[in-house]
A protein has these predicted regions:
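Internal, well-ordered alpha/beta segment that forms a basic, Gly-enriched binding/recognition surface
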Residues: 111-130, 135-136
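Extended, solvent-exposed, turn-rich assembly/linker loops in the middle of proteins
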Residues: 152-244, 255
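Conserved small/polar residues in nucleotide/adenosyl-binding loops
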Residues: 321-325
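Extended oligomerization regions of viral-like shell subunits
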Residues: 207-307
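Assembly/oligomerization interface modules of large self-assembling protein complexes
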Residues: 30-101
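Short, glycine/acidic-rich hinge or "gate" loops at secondary-structure transitions
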Residues: 131-151
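Short His/Asp/Glu-rich catalytic/ion-coordination signatures at enzyme active sites or charged loops
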Residues: 97-111
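N-terminal alpha-helical "arm" segments
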Residues: 1-41
């Protein structure tokens, strides 16, 4: 059996455990039946949400016809994420990672081991790129993807934005640097952060979209947990202003608790996950100073098909999140 055949590798890919992904899976889930296309291009539908209501009508009138809201469709070519792992003869002849010092493994056995471990590593790297793509889309209402070549100085930046014009309507800029809450004469005065978050929630709900949770960078989470008013209100048994209940959602995202923002009790999630950037240093998925007001399932993760020539001389098309090549 050729372990590098597409059929063998497809079966192996399905068995590889997926890297933990928070932003991609929570906010851009993929439906296997609807979101994986059999072509290299995908169709993305966009529809503005409204808060229209039904009218009150006299019984003898019957009903008043309403109008359907339109939508727009864009044909997109998904980003091409491709990475490979070379395997050399000396790696097969020498002891591998985690292998017994007195191992009698043959090069053929080591080759199969490398195939499985390499697929797991490559799958994790691809998942991190998808996670970064999801975060950038949330923060910028679009993203710019640098498509590289085998030369560092030759590349092409390909961008996409999900709004018209030059100003991103989903971006909120505070009028001033955040300040902590203050206590005087037996009364707390909320810091500027409180009104800013309430304004973000209001803007989102006014546009017809739900606001269910708040995701912040690590430094913002530390700032909030150091605020005296938050700590005082969380400890106030006379009113349910909030609660501290640290919960780990993934390895890199955890919930520090919930807080009442003018009647809306919102969970506060902190993201401290990082990836290795092009420079080789760790980069946070969510940059310092970032606050995101959002709800799960705000979008969809669409995938196009991958067509490639196999050893039989014919082209084969793969419909899968990750396609071996």
């Amino acid at each position: 059996m050729d372990i590098y055949s597409t059929y063998f590798m497809l079966a192996a890919v399905r068995e590889v455990p997926l890297e933990q992904s928070f932003f991609k899976n929570r906010y851009f889930p993929t439906d296997n039946a609807m979101d994986i296309f059999g072509t290299s291009r995908v169709l993305a539908d966009y529809k503005e949400e409204t808060q229209k209501r039904a009218p009150f009508v006299l019984p003898r009138i019957g009903s008043i016809p309403g109008t359907r809201d339109g939508f727009s469709t864009a044909e997109l070519e998904p980003a091409n994420i491709a990475v490979s792992m070379p395997l050399t003869l000396d790696q097969l002849q020498n002891r591998g990672f985690g292998e017994s010092l007195l191992s009698q493994a043959t090069p053929a056995e080591r080759e199969r081991h490398f195939l499985v471990s390499d697929l797991a590593e490559l799958s994790a790297r691809i998942s991190r790129s998808e996670e970064l793509l999801a975060v950038n889309t949330i923060l910028n209402n679009g993203t710019t993807m640098r498509h590289r070549t085998d030369r560092a100085d030759v590349y092409e930046d390909i961008g996409v934005q999900f709004y018209n014009g030059t100003n991103n309507p989903t971006q909120f800029t505070p009028s001033a640097k955040w300040t902590h809450s203050t206590y005087a004469d037996g009364k707390w005065t909320p810091g500027s952060w409180y009104d800013d978050i309430c304004a973000m929630i209001h803007e989102l709900t006014q546009s017809g979209r739900p606001a269910r949770e708040i995701v912040v960078a690590q430094d913002v989470g530390d700032f909030l947990m150091e605020d005296g008013w938050i700590l005082a209100m969380l400890d106030n048994r006379r009113a349910e202003m909030g609660r501290i209940n640290p919960t780990e959602l993934t390895e890199f995202v955890y919930q520090i608790g919930s807080f009442n923002f003018k009647g809306r009790v919102m969970p506060i999630l902190v993201s401290d996950g990082t990836y290795v950037g092009d420079s080789g240093s760790d980069v946070a998925y969510v940059p310092d100073g970032t606050v995101i007001v959002i709800a799960p399932n705000v979008g969809r993760g669409l995938y196009g098909a991958v067509t490639q020539m196999e050893t039989d001389g014919h082209f084969h098309t793969c419909l899968l999140y990750t396609s071996p090549s």
